[in-house]
Amino acid sequence: MTKDKEPIVKSFHFVCLMIIIVGTRIQFSDGNEFAVDKSKRGLIHVPKDLPLKTKVLDMSQNYIAELQVSDMSFLSELTVLRLSHNRIQLLDLSVFKFNQDLEYLDLSHNQLQKISCHPIVSFRHLDLSFNDFKALPICKEFGNLSQLNFLGLSAMKLQKLDLLPIAHLHLSYILLDLRNYYIKENETESLQILNAKTLHLVFHPTSLFAIQVNISVNTLGCLQLTNIKLNDDNCQVFIKFLSELTRGSTLLNFTLNHIETTWKCLVRVFQFLWPKPVEYLNIYNLTIIESIREEDFTYSKTTLKALTIEHITNQVFLFSQTALYTVFSEMNIMMLTISDTPFIHMLCPHAPSTFKFLNFTQNVFTDSIFEKCSTLVKLETLILQKNGLKDLFKVGLMTKDMPSLEILDVSWNSLESGRHKENCTWVESIVVLNLSSNMLTDSVFRCLPPRIKVLDLHSNKIKSVPKQVVKLEALQELNVAFNSLTDLPGCGSFSSLSVLIIDHNSVSHPSADFFQSCQKMRSIKAGDNPFQCTCELREFVKNIDQVSSEVLEGWPDSYKCDYPESYRGSPLKDFHMSELSCNITLLIVTIGATMLVLAVTVTSLCIYLDLPWYLRMVCQWTQTRRRARNIPLEELQRNLQFHAFISYSEHDSAWVKSELVPYLEKEDIQICLHERNFVPGKSIVENIINCIEKSYKSIFVLSPNFVQSEWCHYELYFAHHNLFHEGSNNLILILLEPIPQNSIPNKYHKLKALMTQRTYLQWPKEKSKRGLFWANIRAAFNMKLTLVTENNDVKS
């Protein structure tokens, strides 16, 4: 957000300080400089183990009492040395003869009484202030310090030519400590400080001002006096002291710091300075004593542009409010700052005022401030931070008669909105409004200046931007950080919005169309929000990827997931969710298509692998298993009617009937054949199962013809799953003709498994080998078996 205009008084004061800093602070371009901090270590002498490459050495606030050449000689690259707040009494500058690069030396706040001179050429900053020198410690060698910017001195007495050795130097800052200055009654001393841009005089903090010294300075731009204690009796002494210092036409900035005075004397000081060339008057830490009465003040033509008073302590409890406030309200200057004071009010000027800038930060002003005040016609900036304002409606009314007001800062108050049903009234000239750190809610958007360009609402109680708000078409910058907003405000009511600050809110699902509605956005700060990394956030993250990193401040470090737990702490840039998981329609279509493809695939596989056939086999096998469980084993054996069931292809029937059956029946082996033992009227499958159940063994005549016969395979399937004697060897395989493995269809995997796992008898082509073949057949039936005939007759 655009910063509020600062008072010119502060700006000029800042310039003066910058002159000091630039002139005295040593900055190095070498990134490898070596800085050593030995402050507050209780040292009584300089350590000997300091690194040789040390450039910056801080040994302030110790107990060092003396310096020797050996303490510094090995630090040839030393540039900055801080020795303030020690106990050094004697300074011999020759201890620095090996430190040719030394530019910054601070020996303030020691016990120095004497200085021994030695040629030195490199100092830019030399501070000998707040010591016990009787006279100003000036060496003639100081005249060679052509680059000297800052010089701090102490003295108990002054002589006019004390500073003659440095008269030709152009110093940026001279600090003169006169706390221990010996005051001679009825005698005025003189001191000529020829060339200095800033002069800072420090007096005794508790003694009444009584110094009678004529100090004249050429080219003086800034004057600062510290520790001034005045009453009505010595007020004229102080004004006389000022008359010499303010004689030159170059003095623009005058500062009084830590001043205790009566109200009468303060008004006299104001009156003295009013016609002077001073443009910026600053008073810090002002204490008003004794009484406050109405004083005459002539507001003559003045060059004073700005008066700044910060931190007032009023020790007068009963006084005329009008007497106090009138002096300030009627001043004919452009800028007035009175901050951190117990002021409860400020009067409206009687006549049209010249004020362009008013800053009343940290006072006790209420909603009645400047009520119906029509004389602040030139006022452009009004700052009322940290006061007692409570009603935003009344603040708006206050501005109604300020036609030039552009910047209004009422932050850090207790402002509330929505108390009044009437529409808020604002002067239309306001373009910058700071309402931060108040108690404002959503209703504040119905009580805003119509032409506002910069609006600061951070740290309030705003939860949303209402849709029905006055269109702020000129609004360019909006700060709503540290509120409770749950979404990014669109630009429907803010068509010119280009800067949005909305960090530290409760934004979890920002609108995906935000960037589309805010085409002019050049900076957005929306980090540190509890983003919920769900489907709703996908489009927003996608849109962020299309935005320049210069537009999105803090990206990606400040943008992290808060929910779900698995994503907590993860950067938004790493958050990705597929389109399928977030699009319900697409998900349903995808699942439906997948199920359809799966169904088609399964159906095709079923057809290709003859799954219906397997299902029929499983059904028959299940029925067989059920019957087998319900019949005891002894009963099953009593129900056997045949020694063997023969399964063969019709193409192999000639061999079966001419070779196999005759031989087996010759050996009294009862055979079950389908053409003579299948019961008419029953299904083929039922006959097969019935025949297998009533046979002790099943003989399968294998050949390529067998493979091609589906019924043969049924018979093999049921025989393999016969549960009458689980674990028994009730299958006999006879290989009539060789069968290539690749000729067996995949659906006959049972046959493949049997041929690889079980031993089979192969019909030999040679007659000489057939005896062994028949012997193996006989061995398979070499047991006594009780058979039951169809008439239930028992036969062994």
Swiss-Prot record:
Membrane topology: Single-pass type I membrane protein
Species name: Homo sapiens (Human)
Gene Ontology, cellular component aspect: Golgi apparatus; membrane raft; phagocytic vesicle membrane; plasma membrane; receptor complex; Toll-like receptor 2-Toll-like receptor 6 protein complex
Subunit structure as annotated in this protein's UniProt entry: Homodimer (via cytoplasmic TIR domain). Heterodimer with TLR2 via their respective extracellular domains. Binds MYD88 via their respective TIR domains. Interacts with CD36, following CD36 stimulation by oxLDL or amyloid-beta 42, and forms a heterodimer with TLR4. The trimeric complex is internalized and triggers inflammatory response. LYN kinase activity facilitates TLR4:TLR6 heterodimerization and signal initiation. The heterodimer TLR2:TLR6 interacts with CD14 and CD36 in response to triacylated lipopeptides.
Ranges in the topological domain labelled Cytoplasmic: 608-796
Effect of L716R: Inhibits homodimer formation
GO molecular function: amyloid-beta binding; diacyl lipopeptide binding; identical protein binding; lipopeptide binding; NAD+ nucleosidase activity, cyclic ADP-ribose generating; protein heterodimerization activity; signaling receptor activity; signaling receptor binding
Keywords on record: Cell membrane, Cytoplasmic vesicle, Disulfide bond, Glycoprotein, Golgi apparatus, Immunity, Inflammatory response, Innate immunity, Leucine-rich repeat, Membrane, NAD, Receptor, Repeat, Signal, Transmembrane, Transmembrane helix
This protein's name: Toll-like receptor 6
